[in-house]
């Protein structure tokens, strides 16, 4: 096989996998509709679960007032 033939085969394989892996709009709308309906239940909101809105959370009160003490940096190249 020559280089031109190998390149043509490569392009056809890439094109075929792209066409096969791209879902059609009709099929994807039906599957994603159920996910979008319950998305609010699955994704917790940081604002509604912290700072006094929900007392059962593990959020420290200093986060609400931005008064948490800063942790000392560990020595290393990334902290320079």
Swiss-Prot record:
Keyword Transmembrane helix: no
Modification 4-hydroxyproline occurs at: 55, 60-61, 69, 72, 75
List of residues that carry Pyrrolidone carboxylic acid: 39
Locations listed in the record: Secreted
Region forming the signal peptide: 1-21
InterPro entries: Conotoxin_a-typ (IPR009958)
Gene Ontology cellular component terms for the protein in this record: extracellular region
Glycosylation sites: 45
The UniProt record lists the keyword Secreted: yes
Post-translational modification: Contains 3 disulfide bonds.
Residues annotated with Proline amide modification: 75
Keywords attached to this entry: Amidation, Disulfide bond, Glycoprotein, Hydroxylation, Ion channel impairing toxin, Neurotoxin, Pyrrolidone carboxylic acid, Secreted, Signal, Toxin, Voltage-gated sodium channel impairing toxin
GO molecular function terms listed in the Swiss-Prot or TrEMBL record: acetylcholine receptor inhibitor activity; sodium channel regulator activity; toxin activity
Propeptide: 22-38, 76-80
Tissue note: Expressed by the venom duct.
Disulfide bonds: none
Purpose: Neurotoxin with probable activity on sodium channel. Induces intense repetitive firing of the frog neuromuscular junction, leading to a tetanic contracture in muscle fiber (spastic paralysis). In vivo, shows the same effect as the whole venom when injected on fish prey.
Further details from the record: Is only found in C.striatus specimens collected from the Hawaiian Islands.
Protein family according to the UniProt entry: Belongs to the conotoxin A superfamily.
Domain comment quoted from the record: The cysteine framework is IV (CC-C-C-C-C).
Name assigned to this protein: Conotoxin SIVB
Taxonomy of the source species: Eukaryota, Metazoa, Spiralia, Lophotrochozoa, Mollusca
């Amino acid at each position: 096989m020559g280089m031109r033939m190998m390149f043509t085969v490569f392009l056809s394989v890439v094109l075929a996998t792209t066409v096969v892996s791209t879902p059609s709009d009709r099929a994807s709308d039906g599957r994603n509709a159920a996910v979008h309906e319950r998305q609010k239940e699955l994704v917790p909101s940081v604002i509604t679960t912290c700072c006094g809105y929900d007392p059962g959370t593990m959020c420290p009160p200093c986060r609400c007032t931005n008064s948490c003490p800063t942790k000392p940096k560990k020595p290393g190249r990334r902290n320079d």
